Every structure is written in C-alpha cells, then in structure tokens.
Design a protein with these regions (language model features):
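Non-catalytic cap/lid and distal C-terminal segments of serine-dependent acyl enzymes
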Residues: 1-146
Length: 146
C-alpha cells in the first residue's frame, strides 16, 4: 500500500490523482498500482467516495476506515460464513502482492473448519498465470456438473 500511497500523494491526493489518470495519454505501471489502491478504497469503503484507510502523509491507520476494509477480508468473513461453497484457491509462492501469506492462513482456517476446498501454491507470481486455467477451469467444470 505504501508505494501506491506515495504515488497518489505525489499527484496531490486521491482526487488529483484520479483527474491526472483521466487526462494522461499513457498510464505507467505505478499509475496502475495506485489505481488498484483507489479501486479497493472505493469498493471496501466507498461511503464518501474514495478514501484511503491511512493518513496520506504519515501512513497511520485510520481505525474506523480500516475496520470497514477488514469486513471484506476473507479471514474476517470466514468467521461469519462457515458454510462456504467448494472453493479453489491458487497462489504463486513469490506473489508480488504477498497474498500467499493471507491465503496460507485462509487455507488453514478452511481446514480447521472442515470447509471443502482445493489449495494449490505454485512456483510463480501474481502475473503470467494464464496457464493456471488448465488447473482451475477443469476443477470448476467438475463442481458445476457433478
């Protein structure tokens, strides 16, 4: 989150950054990463537009906003949704967003709660995973047709 926050702040804040992205001819990789952070903010806590869960200058957590983000975290949600449908989870062991750590915890909770799922950790990152469809789509097909 810190890199995205730095990029957004460089443009003068969320609204200025959004305006910049609307008017630029080409988005950089940093722009895309910052836009993903804005999209999460709008999705997880869109109460008053796009508001980040941290102070833009100190990166201190805004506990109220962060609690709204955490309501969408699978590790939080599983406590209230113990009857999940069968789930396929795969993640690269070198994921650049480091989601493998949270998914390992989710996998363990699913095991603890005896929720049926498939968990696969593969040699790779978050990108270039099209070949993983050869694993997930047959699994999904089987679930839908059984």
């Amino acid at each position: 989150m810190a890199d995205g926050l730095t990029h957004i702040t460089k443009h003068g804040g969320v609204q200025s950054f959004i305006e910049y992205t609307k008017n630029t001819n080409k988005l950089s990789s940093d722009d895309i990463q910052a836009l993903m952070l804005c999209a999460m903010a709008a999705s997880y806590d869109g109460v008053d537009g796009i508001s980040l869960p941290v102070d833009p200058h100190s990166c201190d957590i805004d506990e109220e906003r962060w609690s709204r983000w955490m309501q969408w975290d699978p590790l939080t949600m599983i406590e209230d949704h113990r009857t999940w449908p069968k789930t396929f989870i795969d993640v690269g062991d070198k994921d650049q967003y480091h989601i493998q750590y949270g998914l390992r915890k989710l996998h363990q909770k699913l095991l603890d709660y005896e929720i049926e799922h498939t968990y696969e950790e593969f040699d790779g990152t978050h990108s270039g995973v099209e070949y993983r469809m050869d694993f997930s789509l047959p699994w999904l097909y089987t679930q839908l047709t059984d």
